[in-house]
């Protein structure tokens, strides 16, 4: 079962790369022969202001973005709670661990998964709050229904990718706890022990904390940039207006919130140790998808505003 889940996650990401990222790469090739293909890709991948008015068929309101993060919060919370309880059970001395590694190695592996899921939880919690209380989406802003479904899949697959190597044993642990509860009619929970609860995070290495710091750096700047974007439509009368944003990383690039997203996922990759191909595929998907979206957004800004700052790049300062 363990091998099946691990390979299922890997296969899912490879499929996502073939279906979504490969077309974006082809559409980015500067050739007039690809104009029709480029328009087709943008009709699926575009959203909001970069979605062409002629591509409104089979779309949903962009305010449905909040649905992604609700799914992300619920799913990540479940994974985090189950994995953390399993890690605490191991720390308490009652555990079943893989015979392929020592108990110390396995505890580190489980603790690292707890840390990664905790970072993801911090991320999706902020995003769901921003979706409902910070952003004021234009009533005309739309996204393709396939992009909507794909994003729902993403927020199930991404958290699972962070713990796929231990997900089967966590599932067995949860199953055994449920079976015990059903059989005995009561849970075998113990008094709360703070030291035991934080013990999964006490054995992390320097790589995890470095990655966590990079994640936090991206997280803070994304929060600031989203606050700036939200302030541009502070009043209902501004719902359909587009204004040039200024401040924080907006002084360098057109899509600093995308750059910050890539930075925080880089932090997750570093915290994971970089040994799991699923997390590499996750990071690559985020970077490729947002780089393409940033390029289209940057071109839209240049066409929309004659006084747009010439020094700004699309997403990577002084590069692109």
Curated annotation (Swiss-Prot):
Catalytic reaction list: a di-trans,poly-cis-dolichal + NADP(+) = a di-trans,poly-cis-polyprenal + NADPH + H(+)
Xref: PROSITE patterns: S5A_REDUCTASE (PS50244)
Membrane topology per record: Multi-pass membrane protein
Ranges annotated as spanning the membrane: 5-25, 64-84, 143-163, 200-220, 243-263, 266-286
GO CC annotations on file: plasma membrane
Subcellular location: Cell membrane
Disulfide pairings: none
Family assignment from sequence similarity: Belongs to the steroid 5-alpha reductase family. Polyprenal reductase subfamily.
Pfam families, per database record: Steroid_dh
InterPro entries named in the record: 3-oxo-5_a-steroid_4-DH_C, Dfg10/SRD5A3
The EC number(s) this enzyme carries: 1.3.1.94
Gene: PPRD1
A GO molecular-function descriptor: 3-oxo-5-alpha-steroid 4-dehydrogenase activity
Main location: membrane
Function: Plays a key role in early steps of protein N-linked glycosylation by being involved in the conversion of polyprenol into dolichol. Acts as a polyprenal reductase that mediates the reduction of polyprenal into dolichal in a NADP-dependent mechanism. Dolichols are required for the synthesis of dolichol-linked monosaccharides and the oligosaccharide precursor used for N-glycosylation. Involved in the regulation of plant growth and reproductive processes.
GO biological process, one term: polyprenol metabolic process
Protein name: Polyprenal reductase 1
């Amino acid at each position: 079962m363990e091998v099946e889940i691990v390979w299922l996650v890997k296969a899912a990401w490879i499929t996502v790369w073939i279906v979504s990222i490969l077309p974006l790469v082809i559409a980015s090739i500067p050739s007039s022969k690809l104009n029709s293909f480029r328009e087709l890709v943008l009709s699926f991948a575009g959203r909001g202001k970069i979605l062409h008015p002629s591509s409104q068929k089979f779309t949903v309101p962009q305010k449905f973005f909040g649905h992604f993060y609700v799914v992300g919060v619920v799913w990540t919370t479940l994974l985090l709670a189950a994995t953390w309880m399993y890690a605490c059970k191991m720390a308490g001395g009652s555990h079943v661990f893989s015979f392929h590694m020592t108990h110390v190695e396995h505890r580190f592996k489980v603790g690292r998964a707890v840390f990664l899921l905790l970072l993801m939880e911090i991320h999706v919690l902020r995003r769901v709050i921003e979706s409902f209380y910070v952003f004021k989406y234009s009533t005309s802003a739309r996204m393709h229904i396939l992009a909507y479904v794909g994003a729902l899949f993403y927020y199930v697959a991404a958290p699972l990718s962070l713990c796929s190597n231990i997900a089967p044993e966590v599932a067995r642990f949860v199953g055994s706890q449920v079976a015990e509860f059903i059989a005995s009619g009561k849970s075998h929970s113990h008094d709360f022990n703070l030291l035991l609860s934080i013990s999964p995070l006490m054995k992390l290495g320097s790589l995890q904390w470095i990655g966590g710091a990079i994640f936090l750096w991206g997280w803070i700047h994304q929060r600031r940039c989203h606050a700036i974007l939200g302030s541009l439509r502070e009043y209902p009368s501004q719902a359909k207006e587009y204004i040039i944003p200024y401040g924080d990383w907006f002084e360098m690039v057109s899509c600093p919130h995308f750059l910050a997203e890539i930075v925080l996922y880089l932090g997750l990759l570093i915290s994971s140790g970089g040994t799991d191909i699923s997390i590499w595929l996750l990071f690559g998907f985020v970077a490729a998808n947002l780089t393409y979206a940033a390029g289209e957004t940057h071109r839209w800004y240049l066409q929309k505003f004659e006084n747009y700052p010439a020094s700004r790049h699309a997403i990577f300062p002084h590069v692109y």
